[in-house]
Amino acid sequence: AINHALETGDFTGEVYDAAVAEYMDRYCNYWIGEDAPECCTRPKKSGSESYVEGWGPNEFAPTGTLKDFEYIDKLDQIKIPSLICSGISDLCSPLVAKTMADRIPNSKWILWERARHTCFVDRHDDYCVELIKWMNQYD
């Protein structure tokens, strides 16, 4: 369904919506239960206007104002310490995360097993330990 949408430019319909839901469950969504971190359970204020303007109406083929934005050659201009965290099953592939880590001076990359785009949820306790250790280096 996603390939069909990319080929036809039609990102609508129940089959496409179901495929996107499955994709997001595999690579992004987090569970919400009684043990979920507070950041996952508090009320959200969200909208799609800026996302659609910048990226476009779908996750897979950028058509918005950022579609031609390229920043890889500018990553070395980041001068503050940077912590890059990603999951093995992340929307941000390990290749993308490693590219950032390799090009941002004074950066550290953590690739979490058993984690998706929301590694701060999927590996919450481990994430907090690593984040505090990293922050203490620069405080």
Annotate each language-model stretch with its function.
Residues 2-76, 80:
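Alpha/beta-hydrolase
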Residues 46-51, 98, 123-127, 139:
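Short amphipathic alpha-helical patches
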Residues 23, 69, 93, 134-135:
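Aromatic-residue hotspot detector
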Residues 22, 28, 86, 117-118, ...:
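Broad hydrophobic/π-residue packing in well-ordered secondary structure
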